Each structure stands twice: as structure tokens, then as C-alpha cells.
UniProtKB/Swiss-Prot annotation:
One of its GO terms (molecular function) is N6-isopentenyladenosine methylthiotransferase activity. This is tRNA-2-methylthio-N(6)-dimethylallyladenosine synthase. Its cofactor is [4Fe-4S] cluster. Keywords: 4Fe-4S, Cytoplasm, Iron, Iron-sulfur, Metal-binding, S-adenosyl-L-methionine, Transferase, tRNA processing. Residues 10-126 form the MTTase N-terminal domain. Binds 2 [4Fe-4S] clusters. One cluster is coordinated with 3 cysteines and an exchangeable S-adenosyl-L-methionine. Residues 388-459 form the TRAM domain. Catalyzes the methylthiolation of N6-(dimethylallyl)adenosine (i(6)A), leading to the formation of 2-methylthio-N6-(dimethylallyl)adenosine (ms(2)i(6)A) at position 37 in tRNAs that read codons beginning with uridine. The gene is miaB.
Length: 505
């Protein structure tokens, strides 16, 4: 990669929109920039560089980006040395359109070449013109780049990039490319590196995690349909790793071995986020979702048999083209049967470039809004009822930062239970000093609401952790590049992982 010749201590700010993939990519961008000599801008400081890591999934993504870019135009005019970069899915989609709409932007880069950002910034500054570089295929796994992690106690670990599905409403495969899987050994090495830094919770990321193992980049790594279940079990062998989560699985490829691994691996959390999208078989077919509601509900039954207290969450789209009232009632019926702990609900958003955008029978906004409100009302009722079942229960929390908007006025702190539920608690009782984000407490739930639980009873136990120590010091992990490029010959093999991790590397 090109080196960057720049004034020392240029400050940066990364603004992230969209999914967990983007959040994790932004950690990579921060790591790259800090390796190139930038420092993160302090709160309230005008940065020398602003990087937008964009999303293209929602209809208003374009308006949000270009509106924010227009707000920066006066700052750029006042300070011509300031640089603005736009990356992510919307940049991959819009390409040269970005600098046509916002000519004060210095760099546009895509989803496949985030590692080029420092060099592109240097080139734009040297050439005094915008640099637009969009690649059609992934240049290197993001894991081969350094990362400046946002959290002292929880970390993202990407197991794959891209997606082989062809959902008619989704533009992500066109922007992220076909699925490419990382080697198990590289993934576990990254997890171990995070744990070595004090991280206690890891979330494995992929557009379709259950497909992991069928698209390895390394030609010497054989296809393995059981690779994801083996990966979960291998994570269970890492000392100091207390919680493992993953997102997102696809119902069409959800297999029994994964359910068994979840139930039998103690540090894999009793939580499953599995997108439904619609409860109508007719709509699922139009979406090209390749499963039907009976299969979806069957998976939930198996998960609850293996893990009776598992919290199951989902994604639902309301108002897909051609959705009838009968179709919508099918969705409500699945919601009633599944009794999701919570649901991320969306009104269908037409995305240019997707098959659904060209479908007939696009629904009126008023119809979609009315159905959306009915779905929200039903799901909130179910969520409250499910949360009320936990009143009086003892739960273990990983204390979190920034999860409670009213914590200052209520004198509470917040944490996540093992099943992912948000709990606000009073840091009083059997404490071992000050409670910090990253510490672990045990509390008894005293009240329930649709979006959270409350524990106003005294804390039963408090365990201080290395993650809490790091948070208190203001230190977050900075993980080095891990793994090799996409099928390229590697120079030297990584150190072998312990045999008991149980996953072929």
C-alpha cells in the first residue's frame, strides 16, 4: 500500500450509518487512519478529516448523506485543508455521482477497498482533486487491516463478507459481492487477540452466518457445511471469552448442528436473531427468501426445545409490493406464534437496482403505515408480556456504556443479560468498588417495560474485570492485521491454534 506523507497529528472523525458490518468496518477505518498518523478528534473539536461510512439499504439513505455533506460545505470553504471522504455501500452504488452532487468531497471509496483510504487521501491532497476508486471485487479481507475498537468489553469479528442470496428487496449483494469466508484459524486468532486485550464478549458477523464454510477464500480449505457449528464450539474453548453471539443467520440454511452447538457451548448466549421478513408464503416467494413460514416456525420450536429460555428476535418488512391484507394477517399470525422477544420492523423501502423496485402493486404509503402501526402494537404487547415473565428472576449483566438515555437522572446504570435483553439497574448493594462498563453484575429484575427491564433491588454480586479496568482508563483494544488476502499465497503460516479448539484451520 502507498505510504502517506502528511502533517503530523491530523485529526479525524468517522460517521457510521447502517448495519453492524459498517460499524465494524469503521473500526478498521479508524485503525488504518491511526496507523497513518491521524488522531481521533476530541468531542467538540473540528476534525481535519471527516469520513462517512454509508448505508444504501433505506430509501432515505441518499438524502441523509447529501444533507450531511451540504452541512460540511461551509466548513470546507473556511478550511480548504480539511478533507471529506465517503465510503461504504452508498459510495459503492453512487460512485462518481457523489462528487457531482458534492464537489467538495475529496475521496470516494467503496466496500471492497477500505484499506486504500490513507493512500487516496494523500493522493487527493497532492493532486488537488477528488479521488474516486471503486473496485468490483474485494481487495482483501477487512481482518487483514488494523482495527481501533470502539468498546473495551465487546468486539465484532467478521467471519465472512458478501452474500450469495438474491432477495428481491436487498441491494447488499450487489454492493458487498458474493460470499467469501475467512479461514477458521484466522477467525479464532482474532477472537483470541480480543480476549487477550480484556474483551469478554464477541459477536461473529456475516450476512448469512449459517452459510459459513461453503465459500472459503483459501483454496486449500475444504468446503464444510458444519463449519459454523464447529466454529461456535471452538469459541467455547477460549479461556476468558464469556459471551459469544452471532448475526445474522438465514432460515433456509439453519441446521440442527448449529442449534446443538448453541445449546451445548456454555459461552454461546441463549439468543437468536433470525430475520422473518414476512409471514406470508406468497410474499416470501416474491422476496426470494427460499423458506416458508412452516420452516421458520419449526426452527423456533427446535431452538426453544434445546434452550427453553432463549430470546428470539427478528426483522420484519411491512408493505412489500403486492402484499395483501391476508398476507399481512399471515405475518401477524407468525408473530403471535413465535412470540419474539423483540422485532426490528421496517416499512418497505424501494431501492433502485433491486427487482422489487420494478414490481407492480407498490403499496400506498397510508396502507403501509397503518399496517406498520398494527404490527408495532402487537409486537410491543408480546414483548411486554415476555419481559414480565422475568420479574423476580436473577440475571447476569455485562455492564454497558451509553445504553440508558435517562441513567443520569434515574441514578441507574445499564447492562445486557446473556439473552441480550437490556436491563437498567441501580449500582447499589454488594459491590466490589465502583461498577464500570465491562464489569459483570448479578441482579434481580423488579419491573418490565416493552423495551427494557428494571432491577431496582440491590446488586447481588459484582465482579470487576480487565475490560472494566480498560474502560476506566479510557483504553480500547487495537487489534493488528490478522490472516491473509483472498486466496493469495501467504508468507509464513500463522501460529497453530490449540488442537482442543476443534475447528479445522
Amino acid at each position: 500500500m502507498d505510504t502517506i506523507d502528511q502533517t503530523p497529528h491530523r485529526s479525524y472523525e468517522v460517521r457510521t450509518y447502517g448495519c453492524q458490518m459498517n460499524v465494524h468496518d469503521s473500526e478498521r477505518l479508524s485503525g488504518l487512519l491511526e496507523d497513518a498518523g491521524y488522531t481521533k478528534a476530541a468531542a467538540g473539536q473540528a476534525p481535519d478529516l471527516v469520513v462517512f461510512n454509508t448505508c444504501a439499504v433505506r430509501e432515505n439513505a441518499d438524502n441523509k448523506l447529501y444533507g450531511n455533506l451540504s452541512h460540511l460545505a461551509p466548513a470546507k470553504e473556511r478550511n480548504p485543508d480539511m478533507q471529506i471522504a465517503v465510503g461504504g455501500c452508498l459510495a459503492q452504488k453512487d460512485r462518481d455521482v457523489v462528487v457531482k452532487k458534492a464537489p467538495w468531497v475529496d475521496v470516494v471509496f467503496g466496500t471492497h477497498n477500505i484499506g486504500s483510504l490513507p493512500a487516496l487521501l494523500d493522493r487527493a491532497r497532492h493532486n488537488q482533486r477528488a479521488e474516486v476508486e471503486i473496485l468490483e471485487a474485494l481487495e482483501a479481507f477487512p481482518s487483514t487491516l488494523p482495527a481501533k475498537r470502539e468498546s473495551a468489553y465487546a468486539g465484532w469479528v467478521s467471519i465472512s463478507v458478501g452474500c450469495n442470496n438474491t432477495c428481491t428487496f436487498c441491494i447488499v449483494p450487489a454492493l458487498r459481492g458474493k460470499e467469501v469466508d475467512r479461514r477458521p484459524g484466522d477467525i479464532l486468532a482474532e477472537v483470541q487477540a480480543l480476549v487477550n486485550e480484556g474483551v469478554v464478549e464477541v459477536t461473529l458477523l456475516g450476512q448469512n452466518v449459517n452459510a459459513y464454510g461453503v465459500s472459503f477464500a483459501d483454496p486449500d480449505q475444504p468446503r464444510d457445511r458444519g463449519a459454523f457449528a464447529a466454529l461456535l464450539r471452538a469459541c467455547g474453548q477460549i479461556d476468558g471469552l464469556e459471551r459469544v453471539r452471532f448475526t445474522s443467520p438465514h432460515p433456509a440454511e439453519f441446521t440442527d448442528d448449529v442449534i446443538e452447538a448453541m445449546a451445548e457451548t456454555p459461552n454461546v448466549c441463549p439468543q437468536l436473531h433470525m430475520p422473518l421478513q414476512s409471514g406470508s408464503d406468497r410474499v416470501l416467494k416474491a422476496m426470494r427468501r427460499s423458506y416458508r413460514k412452516s420452516r421458520f416456525l419449526g426452527i423456533i420450536d427446535k431452538v426453544r426445545t434445546a434452550m427453553p429460555h432463549a430470546a428470539i428476535t427478528t426483522d420484519i418488512i411491512v408493505g412489500f409490493p403486492g402484499e395483501t391484507e391476508e398476507d399481512f394477517q399471515d405475518t401477524l399470525d407468525v408473530v403471535r406464534q413465535a412470540r419474539f422477544t423483540s422485532a426490528y420492523t421496517f416499512q418497505y423501502s424501494k431501492r433502485p437496482g433491486t427487482p422489487a423496485a420494478e414490481m407492480d402493486e407498490q403499496l400506498p404509503k397510508a396502507v403501509v403505515q397503518e399496517r406498520y402501526e398494527r404490527l408495532i402494537a402487537l409486537q410491543e404487547q408480546i414483548t411486554l408480556e415476555e419481559n414480565q415473565k422475568l420479574v423476580g428472576a436473577e440475571v447476569e449483566l455485562l455492564v454497558a456504556a451509553g445504553e440508558g438515555r435517562k441513567n443520569a437522572e434515574t441514578a441507574r446504570m445499564s447492562g445486557r443479560a446473556r439473552d441480550g435483553r437490556l436491563v437498567h439497574f441501580r449500582p447499589e448493594g454488594n459491590l466490589d468498588g465502583t461498577v464500570r462498563p465491562g464489569d459483570v453484575v448479578t441482579v434481580v429484575v423488579s419491573a418490565a417495560a416493552p423495551h427494557h427491564l428494571v432491577a431496582d433491588t440491590p446488586v447481588l454480586t459484582h465482579r470487576r474485570t480487565r475490560a472494566g479496568d480498560s474502560f476506566e482508563k479510557g483504553v480500547t483494544p487495537k487489534t493488528p492485521p490478522i490472516g491473509v488476502g483472498l486466496g493469495l499465497p501467504q508468507i509464513g503460516a500463522p501460529a497453530p491454534l490449540p488442537v482442543q479448539m476443534g475447528c479445522n484451520a
